[in-house]
Regions:
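Hydrophobic ligand-binding cavity/cleft-lining segments
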Residues: 1-44, 149
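Hydrophobic/aromatic beta-strand elements that line small-molecule binding cavities or substrate pockets
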Residues: 5-7, 36, 50-52, 61-67, ...
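Beta-strand/loop substructures that line and gate deep hydrophobic ligand-binding cavities in soluble
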Residues: 77-133, 139, 148
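A short, structured loop/turn motif at beta-sheet edges
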Residues: 13, 40-44, 67-71, 91-100, ...
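A general secondary-structure signal for short beta-strands and their flanking turns/coil
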Residues: 2, 43-45, 58-60, 85, ...
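Hydrophobic pocket/interface hotspot
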Residues: 15-20, 26, 48, 65, ...
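Short, cysteine-centered beta-strand-loop-beta hairpins and adjacent loop/turn segments enriched
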Residues: 53-60, 109-115
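Short, charged/polar surface micro-motifs in flexible loops or helix N-caps
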Residues: 43-45, 53-58, 66-73, 82
């Protein structure tokens, strides 16, 4: 399974990076996030338990988050939950007054014969892409000062 979600935000790359990397603040900022608990770690690498919902359907996972502020990258490896093994990378690229933000999710399920289909259509299309799209859209609204609708 491979998904990509992106948005262009008019704002400061460091401010956007700070908001995107502070996952413990997401439930306050992103209505579709139920909770985020930092389980262990330090300023650049930590273990987090995250819970969101996809239009009322609850999902939960645990991931290792690694921050690379110099290159404006955020990495996650899902270590528990149905998405275990998923690799996620946030890419932030400045372009004048704009910042292009892209989230890439990759998951390989080898459960023959339907594992790849479940990974792509159920996990990828129905959940990952939906939640990532809402996350990017809401961060854009906060940064650009439009509030959350």
């Amino acid at each position: 399974m491979h998904t990509e979600n992106s948005v262009t935000i008019c704002g400061n790359i460091n401010q956007i990076y700070a908001m995107a990397s502070a996952v413990e603040q997401w439930p306050r900022l992103l209505p579709h996030y139920r909770w985020v608990h930092v389980l262990s770690g330090n300023a650049t690498e930590r273990l987090v338990e995250m819970a969101a919902h996809r239009d009322g359907f609850p999902v939960r996972w645990t991931a290792r988050q690694r921050l690379d502020p110099v290159h404006h990258r955020i990495y996650f490896t899902h270590v528990r939950g149905i998405s275990r093994g998923m690799e996620v990378t946030w890419f932030l690229e400045a372009d004048g007054l704009l910042v292009h933000v892209r989230i890439v999710h990759d998951l390989t399920w080898r459960w023959p014969p339907i594992g790849p289909l479940i990974a792509h259509y159920i996990i990828g299309e129905l959940f990952v892409s939906n939640i990532a799209s809402k996350t990017l859209r809401t961060i854009k609204q906060h940064i650009e000062g439009h509030g959350v609708s």
